[in-house]
Regions:
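Gly/Ser/Thr-rich phosphate-binding loop
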Residues: 1-72, 85, 170
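Adenylate-forming
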Residues: 101, 135-164, 193-214, 234, ...
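Conserved C-terminal "lid"/linker of ANL adenylate-forming enzymes
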Residues: 146, 171-173, 226-262
């Protein structure tokens, strides 16, 4: 019965959608570079696209980790390649070592010394950890990751991207580095929240009024609670659950120096 349903779905929905995406003949696909969100990864997998994640650098002779068949996870980049060693530095940065790593940067000994330790470990510049299954999970760039007062990892961009996955949240700024708990500034997406308000018979006069509405606060709080549930399931990030948040009464604006242009 499940195969029959999938066959109908492939004919009517999945097949045409894959064709629109130009992926109807793809047998296997890999994503690398900056990690895509697990929700987007799961979306492509749900279409029947054999999407996998890998992690590598030119300095590593390409691969450091890769997902193999039967070991695909939406939030990790796979286990270490054969003969590749992984190590997590005290600041959370991922280091690797293997017979295939680069010898040096051409005529640039300073850059070589900054990237490669005397005993052969290569600094990736990325923060992450190896989970119980031996799979590497990349959280963010190491320079963007801080620490809570309890010593646990705090990755603001990682949390902000999870918040902005919700249609009602346009921008999010999180705080937690060297603090006892995490907090957030939230910008609502006016169009999405306005549509929600109309469906729920909520009247308002402008951005400030709808942003301060109690029911809108409840809506955003529900999104934050879902993000917190996800963080709570991760032993490395559970201290980063958002304890307090403020919905801003104006949109963050590059003209006011609150956002960059890109």
């Amino acid at each position: 019965w499940d195969r029959l349903l999938y066959g109908v779905g492939e004919l009517l929905v999945f097949g045409p959608l894959k064709n629109t995406l130009g992926m109807s003949r793809v047998r296997v696909a890999y994503t690398a570079g900056e990690a895509i969100g697990p929700e987007l990864f799961d979306f492509y997998r749900s279409l029947g696209i054999n999407l996998k994640q890998l992690y590598g650098q030119t300095e590593a002779a390409v691969f450091v980790t890769m997902q193999s068949d039967g070991e695909v996870r939406s939030e990790t980049v796979g286990a270490a390649f054969p003969d590749v060693e992984l190590k997590i530095a005290e600041n959370g940065e991922v280091l690797y070592r293997s017979p295939g790593v680069f010898q040096e940067y051409y005529k640039n000994p300073q850059a070589t010394a900054e990237t490669k330790t005397p005993d052969g470990w290569v600094k990736t510049g990325d923060a992450g950890y190896v989970n119980e299954e031996g799979h590497l999970r990349i959280i963010d760039r190491a320079k963007e990751v801080g620490k809570m007062n309890d010593g646990s990892m705090f990755a603001p961009k990682f949390i902000e991207n999870k918040l902005k996955f919700y249609q009602y949240i346009k921008e999010a700024v999180t705080f937690g580095d060297q603090k006892d708990y995490a907090s957030a500034f939230i910008n609502i997406d006016l169009d999405a929240v306005a549509n929600w308000a109309e469906r729920n018979n909520i009247t308002y006069g402008g951005y400030q009024e709808i942003a301060s509405h109690d029911k809108v606060r409840g809506l955003i709080e529900g999104c934050i609670m879902e993000v917190n549930e996800n963080l709570a399931a991760d032993s490395h990030l559970r201290s980063s659950q958002i304890q307090r948040f403020i919905i801003l009464h104006k949109e963050l604006d590059a003209d006011d120096g609150e956002l960059t242009r890109t």
